[in-house]
Amino acid sequence: MAFPKKKLQGLVAATITPMTEDGEINFSVIGQYVDYLVKEQGVKNIFVNGTTGEGLSLSISERRQVAEEWVTKGKDKLDQVIIHVGALSLKESQELAQHAAEIGADGIAVIAPFFLKPWTKDILINFLKEVAAAAPALPFYYYHIPALTGVKIRAEELLDGILDKIPTFQGLKFSDTDLLDFGQCVDQNRQQQFAFLFGVDEQLLSALVMGATGAVGSTYNYLGKKTNQMLEAFERKDFSLALNYQFCIQRFINFVVKLGFGVSQTKAIMTLVSGISMGPPRLPLQKASREFTDSAEAKLKSLDFLSFTDLKDGNLEAGS
């Protein structure tokens, strides 16, 4: 049975795949990206080739190369590198899973196939089981994101008896707003040491109350430090301060969501905040507009998110 070297917990950055202006992967900045996450954001776990990383817009060869680069550059700097290996093809998922094991990744994650969909728990489990078996020494995580996959099988149902079918199962990335489903996942698996990683950044504090052990998200690339401060306040049981941090983070997310927010805009914000060029997204996504970037920068400044200083009381309490 596969056990992680230590339980995956805390913040996990869903990494962006940097690209050049002509749409090729820019491997040259990944080392700098690792250092930025660790030193500036205090984030030492990553989730590679997921939604934020445009994993399903990359070729299998590219996904392998990206995974290798993150593992190599993260050696002795990152705590855990989780590789998303989900694909529409079982064979491709198995190939990516085996490759992740070969390069020394710390775990693999898989979404449900979303074109020819599994409509029952048993069918989905059978698919996941075959992928997990391709990397029997690696911890396996299910990536639950029904809004994108269209697979509406509840995570609570999926987890019931899952270790009997997938002995390497170690947890899930829960990217849905259904806190009833999430809460029941936690409540019904208290005897297990599963990692319950919440994937809706703007609702993280609610998930922590429900028992989340960590979080995977795109905003932890550039708001990791602020979110870590929220986690620290929560651990100290300073719930008022934790709530203020969450509200402040929500102000920014609410602002950009109203402008139109996705992978393209995440790349633009990360470039702005980190100073590392993330480049454009790959088609069919379009590059974020200059108007969006300018508006996002102004909002970040108004919330003091570009200074990397502690939030002031006035900044916490005032709706900017």
From Swiss-Prot:
Organism whose genome encodes this protein: Pongo abelii (Sumatran orangutan)
Keyword Kinase listed: no
Protein keywords: Carbohydrate metabolism, Cytoplasm, Lyase, Schiff base
Example GO biological process: carbohydrate metabolic process
InterPro entries, per database record: Aldolase_TIM, DapA-like, NanA
CDD domains cross-referenced by the UniProt entry: NAL
GO CC annotation: cytoplasm
GN (gene name): NPL
Residues reported in the UniProt entry to bind aceneuramate: 51-52, 175, 199, 201-202, 218
Family named by the database record: Belongs to the DapA family. NanA subfamily.
Pfam families according to UniProt: DHDPS
Function: Catalyzes the cleavage of N-acetylneuraminic acid (sialic acid) to form pyruvate and N-acetylmannosamine via a Schiff base intermediate. It prevents sialic acids from being recycled and returning to the cell surface. Involved in the N-glycolylneuraminic acid (Neu5Gc) degradation pathway.
EC number: 4.1.3.3
Alphabetized PANTHER family for the sequence: DIHYDRODIPICOLINATE SYNTHASE, N-ACETYLNEURAMINATE LYASE
Superkingdom in the source lineage: Eukaryota
Single GO term (MF): N-acetylneuraminate lyase activity
Catalytic activity: aceneuramate = aldehydo-N-acetyl-D-mannosamine + pyruvate
Subunit structure: Homotetramer.
Subcellular location: Cytoplasm
Pathway: Amino-sugar metabolism; N-acetylneuraminate degradation
Residues annotated as catalytic: 143, 173
Protein name: N-acetylneuraminate lyase
